[in-house]
């Protein structure tokens, strides 16, 4: 999104506040409470409060302000960000061996996101609804049911899109951040001593005083930066400058004031640790605060759900996930999509997490939070510095210093969160592992299948020359053969000739290709090559944020002089029946998983929006 128009900059910045910062903006609901809840062996003590506040503030400065908003956000692919984009950029100028390692890192990072995203809506919404304990303690048994109701409504409206409701996100989140700042400032004025915690020496003192326990406590501190990946992933929607402007002018000051306000309250009233966020507010403001908190957490959850949809589409287009139905809910914004399968799988997972893992309180979810986030941070550091060295050609010693600085923060955070493994951290890690296995299985087995199908030695040019010299029976009209690779004879063409011994007067070999870019300009959309008097090759290129559409391809072909009409064209496609060959047991398991994924994948006619009555599928049996 361009920010050149200065008049639109405030609007874009406001929109960024509403979408990008929802997750990190709702962290004050639970972060300081989890830090000082007594689980690490110390209570609400002055040194502990100052130490945690200092750690939270400097973590926001170093990780968000410096690492992500100054360095990582520079690595964009035509303005787009995200862990898979970073993976793609990092592997452009490296050896095949290094590229394979970088791809694995990127896929692990993407898988971690899937694992962590199950926790985010649950902990955010529950933390907001838990304000009921302050307003009306007798309603605490309704926290879980109300959380499920709110999330059910949220997932149900996904199919309708969020274009209309989304217009309210920005003003609501701006109001939320102003409330954060106001509540915090009010408490700080009453106890300004808390501002001493801005001194990083309090963080150092915290480690020196509490030693090993302070290291483990980093697992709670990291809750303050959850959602940091959204700053990079949503870069394509808003641009770098509006995201930075929103952070430094609104989000960072508001978060800092609120955290320090909670700290000031705890120094004055240690018993407020049961819910320091809501106890910042005067009694008359509790119900309005509960309502705005619930709205803010719903918006944060919406941003996460949209992020899952976008990541899934990118993984599908890059060939790491099987094709699935993707519905565009807005004609104006390509990022407004809905994926039914992902939506309801995520919903089921979130409800299970709330009912089984939370045990009626969001604090139990905090124990499951952090491993995947910090793991992704480590991978982002490695991938982004690889881009700096290989793509930007920065000095290798300077890049090494940057990487060491990043890892000096990321690795302790990740290691500290490993302590959560048995108390809930296994959940996002397990979900992430499942997604990693699914993505690597689909990619590797798909490659094996295509290689097996293309093992025949027939030359496309030789076959076309032979058909032109000794043509089979020709019938009027146009036929299209979908070809996955250029210069390879489509299976459907061979089987049609073998069994039907007939061709149409005009034959088009169509290849739909995904380029390493989010978008492809219409000028470069279609390349047409006439291979013989009756054969044409058409290569249509799409970016990974675009959805291929054969009707659009035909329109472009018409502009280039190759007239095609959808309802007068026959599409021949091959349908592979797969048989597993002899393999070791572990590869056989992977093969069975691939067969399951392929059986449930979206069929090509639906994937490319081809009318079913124009499609002829020819079956073929392939051993893999």
UniProtKB/Swiss-Prot annotation:
GO CC term (a single one): plasma membrane
Functional description taken from the UniProt entry: Responsible for the low-affinity transport of potassium into the cell. Likely operates as a K(+):H(+) symporter.
Transmembrane segments: 9-29, 49-69, 103-123, 137-157, 165-185, 213-233, 247-267, 276-296, 337-357, 365-385, 398-418, 421-441
Similarity comment: family membership: Belongs to the HAK/KUP transporter (TC 2.A.72) family.
HAMAP family named in the record: Kup (MF_01522)
Superkingdom assignment: Bacteria
Annotated catalysed reactions: K(+)(in) + H(+)(in) = K(+)(out) + H(+)(out)
GO molecular function terms noted in the UniProt entry: potassium ion transmembrane transporter activity; symporter activity
Subcellular location: Cell inner membrane
Membrane topology: Multi-pass membrane protein
Organism: Shigella dysenteriae serotype 1 (strain Sd197)
Keywords from the UniProt entry: Cell inner membrane, Cell membrane, Ion transport, Membrane, Potassium, Potassium transport, Symport, Transmembrane, Transmembrane helix, Transport
Pfam short name (any one): K_trans
Keyword Cell division belongs to the record: no
PANTHER family documented for this protein: LOW AFFINITY POTASSIUM TRANSPORT SYSTEM PROTEIN KUP, OSMOTIC STRESS POTASSIUM TRANSPORTER
Record's protein name: Low affinity potassium transport system protein Kup
